[in-house]
A protein has these predicted regions:
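Short alpha-helix in the alpha/beta-hydrolase fold that links the catalytic acid
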Residues: 255-265
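Active-site glycine-rich loops that stabilize anionic/oxyanionic intermediates
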Residues: 54, 62-65
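Alpha/beta-hydrolase active-site loop
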Residues: 104-124
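Conserved alpha/beta-hydrolase
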Residues: 67-69, 74-99
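Catalytic active-site module of serine/aspartate enzymes centered on a nucleophile-bearing elbow/loop
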Residues: 276-313
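Short beta-strand/loop motif that positions the catalytic acidic residue
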Residues: 239, 245-247
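N-terminal cap/lid segment of alpha/beta-hydrolase-fold proteins
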Residues: 24-48
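Alpha/beta-hydrolase-fold enzymes
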Residues: 134-221
């Protein structure tokens, strides 16, 4: 079941979302929280607890983004009444093993093991509060790999799509192709991982993460069918909860074609699509990760939390 709300032509404007927002409580400070995945791997998390909380939110990040990138948004969620958890996937930031060339993490581990650990931690720590997830890019792609996805009442996807390079916007897609075919493989030969640098501004990527990500981005196969041996136990068709997809017209990665290809992998979810132009949020640019800028606190952030409120109240 899909409900299509497009930003052009009479949709709810994000700038008006503050009219429906609930009162904001006192700010929260992050506290360290160690997560333990089902395979025993520990992950570095930070939790922001909300006074008088009415729910809890797991924030599943994008590839190469550390947990600290999401702290301002998590703080806003806590002020809105949601315990918020941010964390680093295995192989990334504070959850990486050193030397990074010896790190064995794969991208599928994030969906099969790490994201479930985050949700399970919230369930154990904050029961019986309702749970939700918010996934940025790969954090939404791999929702269907989570064996415990049904613990959450609702899911928000931000700039989430397939990574297939041909669905991306030119000239970005040609830069991406160069990254997959030339830069990444060369770095693996030289140092054993893909380091942070001019051609890859994100966190350094372990070999297994890069190679699996590369494989997925060079083929058009959707996430529902088998992409990889490690995704054979995926549960995309089992996701039935409400799902909000937030996409942005100036995002060169999560284009309409790429977003729709990803959402097709969730055939039974209650999907609501919002295609947002930057001017709808009162800005010139949002792109692939601009949603998490604090300037969107009274527009995009409020709209996302209002949507979660309506499903977790």
């Amino acid at each position: 079941m899909a409900q299509d709300e497009r930003a052009a032509g009479g949709d709810r404007c994000p700038r008006q979302a503050h009219r429906r927002a609930r009162p904001v409580s006192a700010p929260a400070s992050p506290s360290p929280l160690e997560l333990t995945a089902s395979d025993g791997r520990t992950l570095a998390g930070l939790v922001l607890e909300a006074p008088g909380a009415r729910g809890a939110l797991a924030i599943n990040g994008a590839t190469g983004f550390r947990r600290e990138f999401y702290l301002k948004f998590a703080g806003y969620c806590a002020r809105r009444g949601y315990h918020a958890l941010v964390y680093d996937y295995r192989g990334i930031g504070a959850s990486a093993r050193r030397p990074l060339a010896a790190e064995e993490a794969r991208m599928s581990d994030w969906g099969r093991l790490d994201m479930p650990a985050a949700l399970a931690t919230l369930a154990a720590r904050f029961a019986p509060l309702p749970l939700a997830t918010l996934g940025h890019s790969v954090g939404g792609q791999l929702l269907g790999c989570m064996p415990n996805h049904a613990l959450a009442r609702a899911h928000v996807m931000v700039a989430t799509s397939t990574g297939y390079w041909r669905r991306q916007r030119a000239p970005f897609r040609y830069l991406a192709l160069g990254f997959w075919k030339l830069h990444g493989p060369l770095m693996l030969q030289l140092v054993g991982y893909v380091p942070q640098g001019l051609l890859w501004p994100g966190e350094s990527l372990p070999r297994g993460v890069f190679l699996q990500w590369r494989k997925w981005c060079l083929q058009a196969v959707p996430f529902g069918p088998v992409l990889d041996e490690e995704l054979r136990d995926s549960r995309y068709a089992e996701v039935r909860a409400p799902l909000l997809s937030l996409s942005f017209s100036d995002d060169p990665i999560a284009t309409p074609a790429a977003v729709e290809a990803l959402l097709a992998s969730y055939p039974n979810a209650q999907i609501e699509r919002r295609w947002i132009r930057p001017r709808e949020a009162g800005v010139r640019h949002i792109g692939h990760h601009g949603f998490f800028s604090e300037r969107h606190r009274d527009s995009l952030w409020r709209a996302a939390l209002d949507w979660i409120d309506a499903r977790c109240a």
